[in-house]
């Protein structure tokens, strides 16, 4: 996993090594926190190692260590500089950790808080929409904002619930907190119709161009003194009769629930999708169906009117290993996909049906296609499926026709296994064939199955570091190769995204999955924590999924590995990760243990445990395929 303690923490940690001439057996090392690191967390853990004999002291007190001498104690942090002195015999490591105060600094004198005025980027909205403003000002101030001829009073907000980051779930600290917010002022207004908003001597009458927007003027009055400051962002009212139309230029336009990468993802929009723009916030565009997209993934279509389409007939065609359903449209419209148990629902926006005829012959995957006009401009197609397990889908536009590809069940070439698969079992850690033995057909329960393994990280991206400095990228690759060997002995056709220590971007890994189209894809990782976690007490195996088609695989493998290996259970998670998002195959990510936990790290680097883990993963995959109806 892209390590949380490297992502969620900012920082400056000053590390001073006071080295004395001692023997190699007296080495003391600290691998976390790194140099130049600061944090907003209220605690931090120190990960490192020293020879197992003797004691390691932190600020004069002995700390807990594993049998091999590894340690990862946590300590509270006060705001400001915190000093830790680690000592083993005559070697010392001094750490200075800076905890930042997240409370906004109150303004000094008659002034607004620094960078506190919002909107802080240009925004555009439709007439009648609610727009809100906020500022930080001295207590007892009278604060307002002038928007054209409208004056909006901003009122003090004495208490607000603060939500922690998503990563707080990983440490069990994800509950909202109530905070007194002295000096926080907020207020909202409904935007008027065009022609009713006056800016000086100008009446705002049209458009999306920022130059036609109004810059809100914030006013603060305290002790009979007044100061005025313009907002960093302008407000523009869009004309419903003159909306811009954009086309998605990315292969998969990233649609979100709001105007930043903090917001959740929606179904990606296929290249060529067209939609009207009904809102803007900085570089983000709100499309007419409700999703937001970064303007860098679009182009403006000059003179285009808001896209609307009719649809009449629908047809299906067989291709190798899949069924393609073709929806002839007048214009490429926004779409979304929702998977359920034995169903897949395709939604077409800005579309109205004139459908009398659909041809849909008997299909290996689909039992029936239903449809309904949910609203005058929103249409749903419900695919009723023959199997509960789905094997992947793709969306693309060919001209103005939408093509939905639904993959068929993989076919196991071992005919004997196809008959007996419901009874197939393997004992713990037993290999169907070993060494120079040739696998007979009955020894190849995964014959004909393509499986992709993704060893996480690589190259400059080390991933998490164990107490000795051993990088996650290396153990990810080692375990992936061991799993490949065991899957191949069971007859599977196994692919790795990388065979050696190299840089490989997340998009490149996703492209490999989409190109190979395996039956399943598994990204293999080891875990770490944000600073607020307890590295000494946290360990175990976790599985992550995103699309419903991957849930059963993630759930089964997670439970199987925890039980067969007698490992701690760190949980089953829905998570928006790059290597769980591919829709072309059931794709999951496994976190096989915590690199930063001193005790679990000893299990991670144990060669016998590595072989057992690889065997259990291969057996779990084999058992999962035997449990599902893949040849119905």
Residue positions per predicted region:
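Short linear recognition/processing motifs and adjacent strand/loop elements at protein termini
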Residues: 2-13, 18-35, 39-40, 53-55, ...
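Catalytic-site microenvironment of enzymes
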Residues: 24, 29-30, 312-322, 337-342, ...
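Aromatic-lined ligand-binding clefts that engage carbohydrates, nucleic acids, or primary amines
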Residues: 48-50
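Short, glycine/acidic-enriched capping/hinge loops at junctions between secondary-structure elements
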Residues: 59-60, 464
């Amino acid at each position: 996993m892209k390590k949380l303690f490297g992502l969620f923490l900012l920082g400056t940690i000053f590390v001073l090594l006071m080295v004395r001439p001692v023997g190699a057996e007296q080495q003391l090392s600290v691998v976390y926190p790194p140099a130049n690191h600061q944090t907003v967390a209220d605690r931090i853990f120190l990960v490192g190692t020293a020879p197992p004999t003797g004691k390691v002291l932190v600020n004069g007190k002995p700390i807990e260590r594993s049998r091999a001498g590894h340690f990862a104690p946590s300590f509270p942090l006060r705001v400001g500089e915190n000093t830790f002195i680690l000592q083993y015999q005559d070697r010392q490591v001094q750490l200075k950790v800076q905890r930042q105060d997240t409370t906004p600094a109150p303004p000094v004198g008659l002034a607004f808080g620094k960078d506190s005025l919002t909107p802080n980027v240009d925004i555009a909205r439709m007439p009648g929409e609610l727009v809100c403003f906020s500022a930080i000002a001295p207590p007892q101030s009278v604060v307002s904002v002038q928007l054209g001829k409208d004056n909006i009073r901003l009122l003090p907000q004495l208490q607000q619930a603060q939500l922690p980051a998503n990563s707080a779930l990983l440490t069990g600290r994800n509950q909202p907190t109530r905070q007194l917010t002295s000096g926080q002022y907020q207020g909202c207004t409904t935007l008027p119709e065009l022609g009713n908003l006056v800016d000086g001597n100008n009446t705002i009458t049209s458009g999306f161009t920022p130059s036609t927007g109004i810059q809100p003027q914030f006013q603060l009055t305290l002790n009979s003194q007044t100061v005025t400051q313009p907002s960093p962002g302008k407000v523009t009212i869009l004309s419903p009769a003159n909306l811009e139309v954009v086309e998605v230029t990315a292969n998969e336009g990233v649609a979100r629930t709001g105007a930043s990468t903090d917001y959740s993802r929606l179904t990606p929009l296929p290249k060529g999708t067209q939609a009207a723009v009904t809102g803007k916030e900085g570089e983000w565009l709100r499309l007419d169906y409700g999703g937001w997209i970064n303007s860098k993934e679009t182009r403006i279509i000059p003179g285009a009117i808001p896209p609307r389409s009719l649809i009449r007939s629908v047809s299906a065609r067989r291709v190798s290993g899949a069924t393609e359903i073709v929806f002839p449209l007048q214009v490429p419209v926004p779409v979304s996909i929702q998977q359920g148990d034995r169903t897949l629902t395709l939604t077409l926006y800005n579309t109205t049906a004139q459908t009398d005829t659909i041809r849909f012959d008997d299909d290996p995957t689909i039992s029936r296609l239903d449809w309904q006009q949910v609203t005058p401009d929103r249409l749903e197609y419900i695919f009723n499926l023959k199997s509960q397990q789905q094997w992947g889908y793709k969306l693309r536009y060919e001209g103005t026709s939408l093509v939905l590809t639904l993959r068929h069940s993989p076919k196991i070439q071992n005919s004997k296994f196809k008959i007996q698969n419901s009874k197939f079992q393997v004992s713990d850690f037993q290999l169907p064939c070993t060494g120079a033995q040739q696998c007979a057909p009955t020894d190849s329960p995964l014959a004909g199955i393509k499986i992709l393994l993704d060893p996480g990280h690589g190259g400059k991206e080390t991933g998490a570091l164990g107490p000795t400095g051993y990088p996650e990228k290396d153990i990810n690759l080692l375990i992936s190769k061991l799993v490949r060997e065991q899957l191949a002995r069971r007859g599977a056709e196994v692919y790795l995204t990388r065979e050696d220590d190299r840089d490989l971007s997340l998009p490149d890994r996703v492209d490999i999955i989409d190109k190979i189209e395996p039956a399943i894809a598994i990204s293999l990782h080891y875990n770490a924590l944000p600073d607020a976690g307890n590295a000494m007490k946290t360990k175990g195996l976790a599985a992550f999924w995103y699309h419903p088609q991957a849930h059963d695989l993630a759930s089964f493998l997670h439970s199987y590995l925890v039980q067969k290996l007698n490992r701690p259970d760190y949980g089953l998670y829905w998570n928006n990760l790059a290597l769980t998002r591919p829709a072309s195959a059931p794709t999951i990510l496994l976190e096989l243990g915590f690199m930063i936990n001193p005790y679990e790290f000893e299990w991670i680097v144990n060669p016998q445990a590595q072989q057992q883990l690889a065997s259990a993963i291969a057996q779990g995959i084999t058992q999962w395929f035997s449990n599902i109806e893949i040849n119905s």
